[in-house]
Regions:
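A compositional signature for long Ser/Thr(±Pro)-rich, low-complexity
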Residues: 2-435
């Protein structure tokens, strides 16, 4: 199918997938519409056929690593945030599309005319512990005089903007810097608590060259971290990493002395998929973090937000591609979504072992395991409301849909509720309390 480019695309800097409910071995490369991804990213076309190299099924009750807390805090258990349900909550969000000016236009669903509001009235309830509503004052106190940075792709930016909006209900962030390139790299300051907040565009975390008009594939150097963000590690106290979707793109992989390891969906190279590559990139990233953070001795917290599933239920440019208005009550995390989550959680586990070997008690790592709870929220995407009032003149033949990013406010606010709760547990706030 011949595809063109669009200037109003949610995927200019983010890729996604739509696929069947059940993936079988060696079918992922044959079934999923990469044209959806590349329509927004490049004016060229092709068909694609990713292979599910590691087919298996995980349910949303999967448990992440249990070692959230340092032993020195005196707590032996932590909250399994991945195991729970979405429950109705009529309190609604802390902010809206008019009170927060950092929301990217394509995710400002309320202002862009989304008529239903039920998607705003749900809270995540873990099965065996409490997840409090986000308290901006608590978060501001915890990160006072610190630098918090988000590094990754446009879903990292999505989560960052959610956090800025919630903090902004108490103290408005002041924009200090933007590189002008679609706001990919920005920095804010919150004077009331002397907090710096940054976003670094780095869709691979490792060194990479993004595809362009001359090359229709990415080039990744898996043994080298992306210094655009890593050079500032010594100045970052709280680091949130969020990547994954860009690994679904065609790419050539290099490792050490420019040796080509293989490729994902490109000609004249050995096809090696992207799961192992994703793991290798995370391994390189965490190793560099442990090495550099171990040198300065400052207390630091590092989080990896696990893979966030897309919810395309049809062609990206057709009416109803993601038209759900209620969360799923139950859904299985499987196929690519499950494998990408598994890789992320495993690399965090391995990184924790390196921290122990390194003897750096000031460095804490955790996976924000949101994949399962995000899977249930097909109702939380902008869909056609990535554009303002898309049906003002009726339903057209083409209706652009964003079924990857999240409305703000929306389900992604929960990612930051979990972030705050982990920080509170690490800080010993729940010591001696029933949680």
């Amino acid at each position: 199918m011949k595809m063109g480019s669009s200037n109003n695309n949610p995927f200019k800097d983010q890729t996604n997938y739509s696929f069947t409910n059940k993936l079988f071995p060696y079918t992922l490369y044959a079934l999923l519409p990469i044209a959806i991804i590349h329509l927004y990213l490049n004016p060229f076309s092709f068909s694609f056929s990713p292979t599910d190299l590691f087919p298996y099924t995980n349910r949303i009750t999967i448990s992440p690593s249990k070692e959230v807390l340092r032993k020195s805090i005196g707590l032996e258990t932590s909250c399994d945030y991945s195991n729970g349900t979405w429950v109705q909550d009529n309190l609604g969000p802390l902010y809206n599309g008019t009170t927060c000016d950092t929301i990217k236009n394509g995710q400002n669903c309320m202002v862009y005319g989304r008529p239903d509001k039920d998607y705003l009235n749900w809270r995540w309830k873990p099965k065996n512990c409490k997840l409090p509503r986000f308290n901006p004052n608590s978060f501001l106190k915890l990160v006072k005089n610190k630098h918090i940075a988000f590094v990754g792709d446009s879903l990292a930016r999505n989560q960052l903007e959610s956090l800025l909006c919630m903090m902004g209900t108490i103290s408005k962030p002041q924009l200090l810097y933007t590189d002008g390139e679609a706001n990919k790299n920005r920095k804010w300051h919150i004077p009331s608590h002397n907090i710096n907040v940054s976003i670094y565009w780095s869709p691979f975390l490792v060194k990479g060259i993004e595809k362009n008009t001359e090359k229709d594939f990415n080039t990744l150097y898996l043994d080298s971290v992306d210094e655009k963000w890593a050079k500032d590690l010594e100045f970052i106290d709280f680091l949130v990493l969020s990547v994954g979707h860009w690994y679904l793109h065609p790419a050539v992989y290099h490792n050490g002395n420019n040796v080509v390891l293989g490729c994902h969906y490109c000609q004249n190279y050995t096809e090696i998929g992207f799961y192992d590559v994703f793991g290798k990139a995370l391994e390189t990233t965490f190793r560099k973090i442990v090495e550099r953070k171990g040198q300065n001795g400052n207390e630091s917290s590092v989080f990896l937000t696990t893979f966030s599933p897309a919810h395309f239920e049809g062609e990206w440019d057709k009416f109803g591609a993601c038209s759900k208005t209620q969360p799923y009550k139950e859904k299985v995390l499987e196929g690519m979504d499950a494998e990408m989550r598994k890789v992320g959680v495993e690399e965090v586990r391995k990184a924790k072992l390196r921290v122990e070997e390194f003897g750096n008690s000031n460095l804490r790592l955790e996976a924000l395991d949101i994949s399962g709870l995000a899977l249930l929220r097909a109702d939380g995407h902008p869909g056609p409301y990535m554009n303002p009032f898309p049906f003002a003149n009726g339903v057209g033949e083409r209706v652009q849909n964003d079924c990857v990013h999240w409305c703000l406010p929306g389900p992604i606010d929960t990612w930051n509720e979990i972030l705050l709760d982990v920080l509170k547990r690490w800080g010993g706030e729940y010591k001696g309390k029933l949680t």
